[in-house]
C-alpha cells in the first residue's frame, strides 16, 4: 500500500515537473505581442512590405546607440575618412547575422534564448543566462549614460537625476505595449529619423570633401599596417554586432501573424522581414558613416580631447575647433540626437532583457515587475558609479568603455548557437542556411571572436 502511494506520488511529481517544463518551453516569445500584427493576404509588394516594416527599426537602434558614437567620431577625427570601409564591412556582417536571427524566429516560432536553453543542460542554461544578462547590463550602461548626459546638457539636470529619469522610462514602455507593438515601432522609427536628420544636417553644413569621403569606403592596407588605426578599426567592428540584438531580432520577427504550416507563407515572412531588416540597417550604416564623416570634417587635425560626449557638445559650439559654423544650435542638436539614441535604445534594451529572462530561466512574473527588474539590474552599476564619483561625467563615461568588454565576452555565446541552429536541417527544414551562407557566417564568427579576444587582451593590458 505504501509502495503504491509512493509510486503514485512519484508519478504526480514527474507529471508536475513535465507540465512546468512544458509550460516554460512552449510559451511564446514576448507572448503579449507575439503574432499581434496582422498581415494582409494577397496584397501588393509595397503594402505587404509596409505591414512587415517595424521590427528592423528596433534592431537597427542597437547599431547606433550612444556606445558607438565616440568610436565613430574618434575614427574620423584621427584618420579622416579611411575607416568608412570598416563601417561598411561591419554593416554587411550585421545584415547577415540579423537576417539569420529573424529567419530562426519565424521558422521555429521560438527565439534564440528559448532554443539555446532547450538544447543545453540546466547548469549551462543558467551560465549562459548570466553571461547574456551581463551583456544586457553592459548595453544598457551606454543608453543610460547617454540619456543622462543628454538631459544634463539640454536641461541642466544633475547627472544622477538624469539617470533616475531614464530608469522611469520603463513605465512609458509598459503604456506603449498596451497601445500595441506597432506604436512602439513607430516611436522608435521616429527617434531614429531624428538622429539621422540631425547628423545629416550637421554633416551638410560641415562641407566634407565628397571625393575623399567616397574613397574612404574602399579598404586600404594602412588599416592593417598602422597599429593604432587597426585597434580603432577593431573597436568599430567589435562594437557593431551586439549579442542582445540577435536575441531581439529572433523574437520580434514573430510579431507578425504567420501560419507556420504553410511553407509559402513562412517564406514570404522571411523575405519581407529580411528586406525590412536590411533597409533599417542601411539607415544605421548611414548614421554611423555620418558620425565618422562629422568627426573627419570638423575635428581632423584639431588638438584636444574629443573622447567624451561633453567634449563633443562643447566643441560644436566652439569656433576655435569647428570654425565659423560653430553655434549653440549645433550643440543642442547633438544633445537632442544623443537623447533620442538613448531613449530608443532603452526601449529595445528592456525588451531584450525580457526575452532573455523568459527564454533562459523561464521566469514568469507580472509584466511591470519583469520590466522594472530588468531596468534596475542595468541601472544599478551606473547609479552606483554616479553616486560614488559625485556625478563626474568623465569617470562615469569610463564605465561606458568598460562595458564594451562585457559585450565582447558575451558575443560568441550568441553567435555560435545562432549559426548552429540556422544550419540545422532538422530544426530549420528547407529554410536552413545555404552552403555559402553557412561558411560565410562561420568565417565571420571566428574572425569576430578573434578580434574581440584581441580587444579584451589589450583592454586588460596583456597585449600591447
Swiss-Prot record:
MF (Gene Ontology): cadmium ion transmembrane transporter activity; manganese ion transmembrane transporter activity; metal ion binding; symporter activity
Cited InterPro entries: NRAMP_fam
Feature: compositional bias, Basic and acidic residues: 1-20
Keyword Cell membrane: yes
Keywords: Cell membrane, Ion transport, Membrane, Symport, Transmembrane, Transmembrane helix, Transport
One Gene Ontology biological process: iron ion transmembrane transport
Residues that span the membrane, as ranges: 50-70, 82-102, 125-145, 157-177, 186-206, 229-249, 281-301, 321-341, 376-396, 399-419, 443-463
Topological type in the membrane: Multi-pass membrane protein
Subcellular location: Cell membrane
GO cellular component, one term: plasma membrane
Pfam families the UniProt entry points to: Nramp
Primary residence: membrane
Annotated spans, Disordered: 1-28
Family recorded in the similarity comment: Belongs to the NRAMP family.
Function summary: H(+)-stimulated, divalent metal cation uptake system.
Protein name as annotated: Divalent metal cation transporter MntH
Organism: Lactiplantibacillus plantarum (strain ATCC BAA-793 / NCIMB 8826 / WCFS1)
Lineage, broadest ranks: Bacteria, Bacillati, Bacillota, Bacilli, Lactobacillales
